Structures are given as C-alpha cells and as structure tokens.
Amino acid sequence: MAAEKIRVGIIGASMRNGWARDAHIPALSALPEFKITAVSTSRQETADETAKHFGIPHAFADPYKMIQHPDIDLVSICVRVPFHHQLGMATLNAGKHLYCEWPLAATTEQAQQMRDLAARKGARHMVDYKPAEPAGSIASGTWSPRATLARCFRAR
C-alpha cells in the first residue's frame, strides 16, 4: 500500500516573483510523494493568482491561518529572513514539519529555539541552501518528514 502524500503549504508563493514560484512549486509538483495543498502571500489576490495558476486548492493572505489548516503536513517558508523565526515557530507549534530557505533564522539563538521546539514536537525541519540547484534537497528526493536520519553536509 502506497504512503499518503505529504501535503505542503508554501508561505511566500507569489506568482509575480521569487523562489517559491521558480523552484519550490515546480520541484514539489514534480515529485509524486508531495502535494501542494495551500499557498500564502501577503495579499489575497496574489495568493489566489498563484493557486489558480498551479491548481492549488487553498490560498491565504494570512500565513498563520494557512499553517493551522488541517490539510497541511509540511510548511515551506519562502519569505525574507526576518520572518523565518516567527513563522517557523508557529509552524512547529502547530505540529507541522518545516522546510525553510537559508538561513533558518536571523540569529543563532533563534535557530536553536526552532531546533529545540522541533525536537519537543517530534517535527522534522530542514534548511536548504543550494543557490545553483533551487529546492535541491526536495527535488533530489533526499529529504522527507518521514525520514529518521538527518545529516549535515556543510556548516560554517
């Protein structure tokens, strides 16, 4: 019996520009184990535009409402760094898995808070930095919230 698809909500998924449009949505859409179920942007009209273009069922102007939606297992954060910590903490507090663009947070302390909360909640989290291969870990199939082992390939 096949495993259920991992349902993804993407924060910062504007059709007008950005990594979500150019990398995350195409990569996730190409993989059979993922299904994008929601997008969020700062304005409802751009969220609706993205959802319609890609055939995504839910669109939100409020990322926190999207995070709480029951049809989401994994949240992908594709917004500016100052918002990573707050959105990441909300995601983890909701019991969702987290995939975030680099850097995970603005400070080491914020990143440690997110790491600790993920451990307490039993959630998987990952930050991806592959400018030459956007959404590289998702596209290559090397990451899944169902995985039991994470490995750091590079650190500074």
Segments (PLM) and residue ranges:
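Beta-loop-alpha module in the N-terminal Rossmann-like domain of NAD(P)-dependent dehydrogenases
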Residues: 45, 54-117
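Short, Asp-centered acidic motifs that coordinate Mg2+ and/or phosphate
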Residues: 38, 58, 74, 124, ...
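Acidic-histidine catalytic/liganding microenvironments
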Residues: 31, 69-70, 134
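Hydrophobic residues in well-ordered beta-strands that form the structural core
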Residues: 10, 60, 100, 125-127, ...
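N-terminal Rossmann-like dinucleotide-binding module
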Residues: 1-54
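A contiguous active-site-proximal alpha/beta segment in oxidoreductase catalytic domains
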Residues: 105-156
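Structural signature of beta-strand start/N-cap positions in the alpha/beta core
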Residues: 7, 35, 71-74, 97, ...
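Glycine-centered tight turns that cap/initiate beta-strands
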Residues: 33, 55, 71, 148-151
